[in-house]
Amino acid sequence: MPSMNQKIFEMGFSVETVSVYLLCCSLADSDARISVKNLLGVWNATEDELNKGLNALEDRNILIRTVSDQEGNVFYRLAEFKDWV
């Protein structure tokens, strides 16, 4: 089942934050890990905009940070829709 939920378009996020969400869904749907490194590989705006989008999604419990390793790699997972705030 695809991970993208249409509700994301009704939550008042910036275009950049919605784009981050869609990229996260694309990675998840292709069984790739959602990580800053993987996102930067397909992100076409600034790293600062990516981080702002990630933070906004974390703040609303849409994206959950699962691991930050000693090498600075950060990994996420998508939360279930029922857990969004």
Language-model features, listed with the residues they occupy:
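Short alpha-helical segments that sit at the start of domains
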Residues: M1-V20
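Short active-site loop/helix that positions an aromatic residue
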Residues: L23
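Winged helix-turn-helix DNA-binding recognition segment
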Residues: E10-V15, S26-R77
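Short, amphipathic alpha-helical interaction segments positioned at domain boundaries
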Residues: E80-V85
